[in-house]
């Protein structure tokens, strides 16, 4: 188990939950992670933004556990139910190199925060053996400033959510009343660390921040508040991130128990998109309404791990 000056596995404080689980003894933290690194899938993924997936796919590793508790999570078998396979740091390094050999445009780490020390150790090993692809941190946006700083020199691209502004809504849907209070300064730090988006000759992102927002049914007003924050960042530093507004919400997991047991309507989503455009958030991605399909969720069958 990795142990650094920044991580004491006996009292884990990697995420904003600060649950202090004794992961050295195999205790499970709030995030569902214990002492052994777990992943559920490693494969080329073609359903990210075009500048991430490109033509050859994003080399995506889905890690088990999550620091949020989203009742609508499409990845709930791995985020909430513990699905995954225990792997070593050395094997993870081999996975990164294999994805590179398959032609991936990048290495895409999905919900990596609870495994940060393990992943950093694996990246060090893989780089020593020739890994050279951009590294993507695919995060729900709920990260401590300390964690973001520890990723410096490892993460090239932040693919981050800004899910909510309302504390009541984030408490209800993700068990995180402090979500926006944590995410806003965290995203500030991500943008400061990564800088403005940089693309290669083929239009594939090499560094920068993509800021995602998934529109939820019945909560257009909170989407407006999220977009207001995005617009404020864009006004302060034009072009500092790429906005990505998504319509793919599908009522997975326990969504129906929390008043969001339906897909977003075309009218609701059009209101969100029009608001984004009115705010000048046009230099990014607006997902088609038809994207709300279960096929966008990969099969967590331990492929590649």
List the model feature ranges, each with a label.
Residues 1-27, 196-305:
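Auxiliary Fe-S-binding modules of radical SAM enzymes
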Residues 27, 31-153, 157, 166-167:
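Conserved Radical SAM active-site core
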Residues 59, 107, 135-137, 158-160, ...:
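Hydrophobic faces of well-ordered beta-strands that scaffold small-molecule active sites
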Residues 79, 116, 141-144, 162-180, ...:
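Conserved radical SAM core fold
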Residues 87, 114, 174-182, 260-267:
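Alpha-helix N-cap and loop-to-helix initiation/capping positions
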Residues 123-134, 185-193, 266-274:
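Alpha-helix-loop-beta-strand connector modules within alpha/beta enzyme cores
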Residues 152-169, 240-248:
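Non-cysteine beta-strand/loop elements that form the S-adenosyl-L-methionine
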Residues 171-202:
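Anionic-ligand binding region
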């Amino acid at each position: 188990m990795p142990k650094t000056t920044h991580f004491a596995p006996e009292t884990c404080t990697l995420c904003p939950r600060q649950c202090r689980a004794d992961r050295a003894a195999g205790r499970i933290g709030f995030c569902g992670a214990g002492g052994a690194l777990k992943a559920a899938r490693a494969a080329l993924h073609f359903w990210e933004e075009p500048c991430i997936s490109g033509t050859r796919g994003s080399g995506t590793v889905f890690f088990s556990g999550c620091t949020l508790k989203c009742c609508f999570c499409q990845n709930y078998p791995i985020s909430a139910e513990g699905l995954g396979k225990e792997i070593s740091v050395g094997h993870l390094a081999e996975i990164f190199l294999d994805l590179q050999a398959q032609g991936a445009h990048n290495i895409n780490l999905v919900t990596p925060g609870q495994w940060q020390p393990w992943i950093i150790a694996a990246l060090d090993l893989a780089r020593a053996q020739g890994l050279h692809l951009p590294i993507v941190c695919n995060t729900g946006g709920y990260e401590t400033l300390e964690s973001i700083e520890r990723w410096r020199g490892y993460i090239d691209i932040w693919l981050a959510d800004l899910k909510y502004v309302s504390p009541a809504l984030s408490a209800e849907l993700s068990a995180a009343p402090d979500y926006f209070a944590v995410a806003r300064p965290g995203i500030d730090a991500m943008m400061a660390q990564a800088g403005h988006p940089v693309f290669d000759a083929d239009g594939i992102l090499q560094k920068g921040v993509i800021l995602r927002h998934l529109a939820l049914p019945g909560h257009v007003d909170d989407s407006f508040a999220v977009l207001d924050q995005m617009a404020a960042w864009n006004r302060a530093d034009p072009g500092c991130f790429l906005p990505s507004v998504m319509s793919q919400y599908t009522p997975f997991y326990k969504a129906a128990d929390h008043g969001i047991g339906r897909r977003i309507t075309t009218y609701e989503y059009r209101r969100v998109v029009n608001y984004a455009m009115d705010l000048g958030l046009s230099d990014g991605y607006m997902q088609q309404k038809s994207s709300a399909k279960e096929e966008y969720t990969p099969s967590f069958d331990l492929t590649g791990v």
